[in-house]
Swiss-Prot record:
Assigned keywords, A-Z: Transferase
EC number: 2.5.1.-, 2.5.1.35
Function: Trans-prenyltransferase that acts in both the aspulvinones and butyrolactones pathways. Prenylates aspulvinone E and butyrolactone II to yield repectively aspulvinone H and butyrolactone I.
InterPro entries (UniProt xref): Aro_prenylTrfase (IPR033964), Aro_prenylTrfase_DMATS (IPR017795)
Disruption phenotype: Leads to the accumulation of aspulvinone E and butyrolactone II.
NCBIfam families, A to Z: arom_pren_DMATS (TIGR03429)
Catalytic activity: aspulvinone E + 2 dimethylallyl diphosphate = aspulvinone H + 2 diphosphate; butyrolactone II + dimethylallyl diphosphate = butyrolactone I + diphosphate
Pathway: Secondary metabolite biosynthesis
Residues annotated to bind substrate: R90, L91, R112, K197, R264, K266, Y268, Y338
This protein's name: Trans-prenyltransferase abpB
Lineage of the species this protein comes from: Eukaryota, Fungi, Dikarya, Ascomycota, Pezizomycotina
Family stated for the protein in its record: Belongs to the tryptophan dimethylallyltransferase family.
Length: 379
């Protein structure tokens, strides 16, 4: 669940009180106006997410300090809604390079930030596809946090990287939002540690090679050998015909910054869906997966769709659905489907999601006993 990162106006001192974001902003200072504006327009929201998800004040300071020193400096020039940046991120429809979200699981709620780090020359002739800043950020994180493993990053960087001459040609062809190549996601855990994940958008690489996007993705994972079998073969068998027929758009890959043998790889796709049967087909890989875990997850998904009154009736309700499959060595793919909640009534959805948490007996979710109003604040 995500929320727009740009506030309509900076919060007043009265409404902010002595919140950690306010104190840090007053005491650390900023080297330029861009960083100060990014802080004023994003730190209050991050603070709100952390507080609503029951992070204690010490963790709020810890993660806001990390945000101040390691994220704010790589967001590039500040731009307000309605203005056009030199380089647009895929993280939002407005091209902003930052997104906050909350991951709800039985163990509780985890706040995540996703970052499309912007280089000094991003979108310009020197770096038309903004290929270098994310690499610099990850190299720095690997020094600061020894648990960050860049083995998979180096593999996919060699697979998806584009030389400068080709990058110039590709940038001239692609729309601005399709020029982004990678982003970083950071989970801020309640034990004080962080986990890091990298996302690759490969449309630019496909444009440079002339190969279909799904072929570029599958080839890159296959060159890791058997590290992600049998899941990779099952996905390729199911998704390739859908992609070849133009029915599914597969264009995004992510992985954990941990040793390869421990990492997950996720492949993300979009498909036009007009029925619950189509959702079932995606969830079970066309009916080929019917193990107890898969079918239990499908039952929960159907229940959530019913509670949220997310149904279909006729072609007028056909809409794009984002989904992904997680693969690890020795296991079958694990599906995940994103139910679109944009342009809906947040408090209605919050009340229904609270009912889901209660049905699942997820007592560690912060909003389990709440009215739904607090949950709506992070939708």
């Amino acid at each position: 669940m995500t929320k727009s990162i740009i506030a309509s106006e900076p919060p007043s001192a009265e409404s902010s009180g002595r919140l950690p974001w306010k104190i840090l902003g007053q005491t650390t200072g900023f080297p330029n106006q861009d960083q100060e504006l990014w802080w004023l327009n994003t730190a209050p929201l991050l603070n709100e997410f952390l507080a609503e998800c029951q992070y204690d004040v010490h963790l709020q300071y810890q993660y806001l300090t990390f945000f101040r020193h390691h994220v704010i400096p790589v967001l590039g020039p500040f731009f307000a809604p309605g203005t056009t940046p030199n380089f647009a991120s895929r993280l939002s429809k407005h091209g902003h390079p930052l997104d906050f979200s909350v991951n709800f699981q039985e163990s509780g709620a985890t706040v995540r930030m996703s970052l499309g780090a912007i280089g000094s020359f991003a979108g310009l002739q020197q770096d038309p596809l903004n290929q270098f800043r994310a690499r610099e950020v990850l190299d720095k994180l690997a020094i600061l946090y020894p648990t960050v493993d860049l083995q998979l990053f180096k593999h996919f960087e060699s697979e998806f990287g584009i030389n400068h001459a080709d990058a110039l040609k590709v940038a001239a062809k692609l729309p601005k939002l399709d020029r982004a190549t990678k982003m970083i996601a950071i989970d801020m855990l309640k034990n004080g540690s962080m986990t890091f994940k990298v996302y690759y958008m490969v449309r630019s690489k496909a444009a440079a090679t002339g190969l279909p996007v799904h072929t570029v993705l599958f080839n890159a994972v296959q060159r890791l050998g058997s590290a992600f079998e049998p899941g990779l073969s099952l996905l390729k068998q199911f998704l390739s015909p859908l992609c070849d027929a133009g029915e599914t758009d597969l264009g995004l890959l992510s992985f954990d910054c941990v040793p390869t043998e421990s990492s997950r790889i996720k492949l993300y796709a979009i498909k036009q869906v007009g029925s619950l049967d189509a959702i079932r087909n995606l969830w079970t890989l066309g009916g080929t997966m019917d193990d107890p875990t898969t079918m239990k997850g499908l039952a929960v998904l159907e229940h959530v769709c019913e509670l949220l009154q997310f149904g279909w009736s006729g072609d007028s309700r056909v809409q794009p659905i984002l989904f992904n499959y997680e693969i690890k060595k020795g296991s079958t793919p694990k599906p995940q489907i994103y139910i679109p909640l944009a342009d809906r009534y947040d408090e209605f959805d919050a009340a229904k999601l609270k009912a889901v948490f209660q049905d699942l007996d997820w007592k560690r979710v912060p909003f389990y006993q709440d009215t739904g109003k607090d949950l709506a604040s992070v939708l």
